[in-house]
């Protein structure tokens, strides 16, 4: 392993293990200094900045798209040249399956960035390509479905959700299927899927959010509130969750409760404004 690769690995581990945002940013920027074509570093910088500087996060995500596409083309060219070689010239250390998996991972990461940029058609296409490169990535079926759902392509999204659920259980997939069925007017079927989402969910913040949304669609406001509150308590740094519970209280005419969460947002915004100035 080259010195550059070992240094990059060290910086990547440091970035992933630290809880300090400034240190994460510093590590990823150092990786870029070592390798300006590393798409993962740009991708990760976009993720970090998304908490407090939308302009910078968008910039880094867009740069990562260019880097991922460049890396994919490089892999394709290398794979094409390798496959054209006579068998006697091919290295036994190279497994074509590993190359396809590597390309597939690049496509998957590209899909994640497109999702972050709200470019859902491009995201779904990237996930489809990831699945073509590595059929073992069954979870791509779910990501394709969600991107299509966000792009209002409900019929195609439903197809991928059903295929995904035929291969593995997923409370999140049940939720999106329920939403599509409700949109199509299949009320009874959608209720079954909302209950499946609730029954199969776990005991974490994301599960509680899905339970809250499902109970709200089932008309049980008290349980919807219970799980929204629980979701925020388990992940108090997630600003989107706090906005969700504010919207919930406002929709149900509970302005005082909404105001209490607005205060949490105000405090967080003050902190984020300071971070934006210093980073």
Go through each PLM region and give its residues.
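Short coil turns that delineate tetratricopeptide repeat
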Residues: 36, 69, 101, 135, ...
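Canonical positions in the second alpha-helix
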Residues: 30-31, 64, 96, 129-130, ...
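Register position in tetratricopeptide repeats
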Residues: 50-51, 109, 116, 150-151, ...
């Amino acid at each position: 392993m080259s010195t550059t690769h070992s240094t990059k690995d060290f910086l990547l581990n440091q970035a992933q293990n630290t809880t300090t945002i400034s240190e994460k940013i510093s590590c990823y920027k150092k990786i870029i200094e070592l390798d300006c074509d590393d798409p993962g570093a740009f991708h990760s910088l976009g993720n970090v900045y998304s908490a407090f500087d939308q302009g910078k996060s968008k910039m880094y995500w867009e740069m990562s798209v260019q880097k991922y596409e460049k890396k994919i083309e490089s892999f394709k060219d290398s794979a094409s040249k390798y496959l054209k070689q006579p068998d006697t010239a091919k290295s036994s250390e190279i497994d074509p399956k590993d190359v396809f998996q590597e390309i597939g991972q690049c496509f998957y990461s590209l899909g994640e960035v497109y999702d972050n940029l709200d470019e859902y058609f491009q995201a779904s296409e990237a996930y489809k390509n990831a699945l073509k490169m590595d059929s073992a990535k069954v979870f791509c079926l779910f990501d394709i479905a969600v991107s299509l759902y966000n792009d209002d392509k409900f019929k195609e999204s439903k197809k991928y959700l059903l295929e995904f659920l035929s291969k593995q259980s997923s409370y999140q997939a049940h939720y999106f299927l329920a939403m599509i069925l409700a949109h199509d007017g299949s009320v009874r079927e959608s209720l079954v899927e909302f209950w499946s989402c609730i029954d199969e969910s776990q005991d974490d913040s994301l599960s509680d959010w899905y339970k809250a949304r499902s109970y709200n669609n089932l008309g049980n406001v008290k349980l919807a509130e219970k799980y929204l509150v629980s979701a925020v308590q388990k992940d108090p740094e997630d600003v989107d969750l706090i906005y969700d519970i504010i919207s919930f209280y406002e929709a149900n005419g509970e302005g005082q409760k909404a105001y209490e969460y607005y205060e949490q947002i105000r405090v967080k915004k003050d902190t984020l404004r300071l971070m934006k100035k210093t980073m």
